[in-house]
Amino acid sequence: MTKSLFAVLVAAGVMRAGPCEGGGTTGLPDGLVTGTWGGENAGLIADDTSAHVHIACTYGWVHQAIDPGSAGRFDVPGEYLLRAYPVAVGPSMPARFQGSVRGFVMTLNVVVTDTTAGGDSTVTLGPVKLLFGLEPKMQMCPICRRTGERRAM
């Protein structure tokens, strides 16, 4: 079975199972977003204290747990680098990581305050759809795999 077909079957099973499986609306046993979440040219790798996000050739960090709560929605602060590949350029900028989790499907937006644009303007990345347990399918830009790599950036 190809990875694409497997991903479709997993997604169909998750959507059919709905919010009553696992930990309620989020489907997460402890209620927190943890583990690897992957999609097309996007990914999120999280533990109970932080998360690292890639959307295309950009990346950012959340320095706290992501807790979607009983409604399955989250909005947490972090930082983001808009020009990250092939060579990181510029400072990390303030960002909001906003989204929802339903079952094992996450919808994510990142709203970055671009402080380098000569006045604070915002750049919105997303929405991207991520599936729990699916490896991110990055195109030309690699994703950081280990916690040490994430923190060293």
Where are these regions (language model features)?
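Sec-dependent signal peptide recognition
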Residues: 2-8
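Short solvent-exposed loop/turn micro-motifs enriched in small/polar/acidic residues
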Residues: 37, 59, 90-92
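N-terminal glycine/threonine-rich, aromatic-flanked beta-hairpin/loop signature
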Residues: 40-82
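Tryptophan-anchored aromatic micro-motifs
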Residues: 24-45, 51, 76, 108, ...
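An anionic, turn-rich surface loop/hairpin at beta-sheet edges
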Residues: 76-98
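Extracellular Ig-like/FN3 beta-sandwich strand-entry sites
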Residues: 103-105
